[in-house]
Design a protein with these regions (language model features):
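An amphipathic, basic-hydrophobic helix/alpha-beta surface used to engage anionic
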Residues: 13-272
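Von Willebrand factor type A / integrin I
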Residues: 1-29, 47, 288-365
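Short beta-strand-loop
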Residues: 265-290
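Intrinsic-disorder/low-complexity, polar/charged segments
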Residues: 1, 62, 172, 209, ...
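Generic detection of short hydrophobic beta-strand segments and adjacent strand-loop junctions
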Residues: 93, 144, 275-278, 359-365
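Short, structured coil/loop segments at alpha-helix boundaries
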Residues: 70-72, 98, 149, 173, ...
């Protein structure tokens, strides 16, 4: 009789617990995700913090979330991905009443892009797994922008780093106060700060420096994903990613040399042509590259010829394959007095102004 009474008490306790969790399990339970940095480069690590708050006295022995994130983000654990390239990373919590729980994860960003990370729902239950409940989570996702990392000079053959920046011209309005080309005898009309004391000591008389005239370089960067001239389709994903990294490399060089540049991409819905310089403008263009989807809009020759190159001093072409036709178009620009350079995986025309990208990929072109 005592055993039956004990079993009845246990059953009653389980039923009470079941209804308590079914009625009150959802109350006062919240989830949010926080990210250390919202903008990083490829290869960087970022901290993701999950925060669950149980704002009631009833403890929650089992709460489960699933972080939904692209497979390009490495959480350090194995997770299966679906056909869309999305993986789910489970997290299990046990929370006391009136308690906040934090879980910190390190994420390695292996590919550029703009991603959303976070849980879509919370799943919880009582101690026996009977009183189950699900809470949809809204506004719990965070956005992460992964900027493309530039190639290095070692990824090109030959290592042809053109010195973009100030270029010599024959006539200009003002002298360049920083560029010196020889010295001449001081006539008394030059300012005192133009006297070269080293040259004066060697010549035995006052000598003033000669200053050159310069003009700032302004380049247009043409980014093309077309596989070949006869195939109006983008190259493989790996090759297109290399093209984006090469564009990031050229923009980095332009910033180092204080040169003004504009980035034009051969894709549909191209943004209006805008030139600029400096770290801020380069960051804007890197954000464009982070969001771009490799595609083809025009044939490479048409893409090159429709650009207003007359507004620039240099033309930089980045393409999977530099063909004879593309080389002829660039040679025309060269004959017009423009600086010309190309970066390509394959240099079919053996153009001397082309640097070949030597980094290996699994699927070429």
């Amino acid at each position: 009789m005592e055993i039956i009474f004990i079993l009845i008490l246990i059953a009653a306790a389980i039923i009470i617990e079941y209804f308590s969790y079914m009625r009150n399990g959802r109350k006062g339970l919240s989830y949010r995700a926080e990210i250390g940095r919202s903008e990083v480069f490829e290869g960087d690590e970022v901290i993701l913090t999950e925060v669950i708050v149980n704002d009631k006295l009833l403890p929650l022995p089992f709460v489960k979330t699933e972080i939904v994130a692209p497979a390009f983000l490495d959480f350090g654990i194995k997770a299966e991905k679906n056909k869309e390239g999305i993986c789910c990373i489970p997290s299990v919590f046990s929370i006391k009443g009136r308690e906040k729980c934090r879980r910190v994860r390190k994420i390695k960003c292996t590919c550029r892009g703009i991603f959303e990370i976070g849980a879509s729902s919370l799943y919880g239950s009582d101690l026996f797994g009977l009183g189950e409940f699900i809470i949809p989570v809204t506004d719990a996702k965070v956005s992460l922008t992964v900027l493309p990392s530039p190639l290095s000079a070692d990824d090109f053959s030959p290592d042809n780093r053109q010195l973009y920046g100030d270029i010599l011209v024959r006539r200009f309005i003002c002298e360049d106060p920083f560029l010196i080309n020889g010295a001449h005898e001081y006539s008394g009309r030059e300012p005192m700060n133009s006297i070269s004391w080293n040259a004066s000591a060697r010549a035995g008389k006052l000598m003033a420096v000669n200053r050159d005239y310069t003009s700032c370089s302004k380049m247009i960067i043409l980014l093309n994903f077309q596989r070949r001239d006869d195939i109006v389709a983008p190259a493989t994903e790996e090759v297109c990613e290399l093209m984006i990294k090469a564009a990031a490399f050229v923009m980095e060089m332009a910033e180092e040399m204080k040169a003004e540049f504009a980035l034009v991409i051969n894709i549909p819905d191209q943004e209006p042509l805008t030139a600029g310089s400096g770290a801020g403008f380069r960051l804007e263009q890197l954000r464009r590259l982070a969001a771009v989807e490799a595609d083809c809009y025009l044939r490479i020759e048409d893409f090159i010829m429709e650009q207003p190159v007359g507004e620039f001093t240099d033309v930089i072409l980045i393409t999977p394959t530099l063909s004879f036709e593309s080389t002829d178009r660039l040679e025309d620009f060269k004959n017009q007095g423009l600086g010309v350079h190309a970066y390509a995986m394959h240099n079919e025309s053996d153009a001397d102004f082309c640097s070949q990208i030597t980094r290996r990929v699994k699927e070429d072109i």
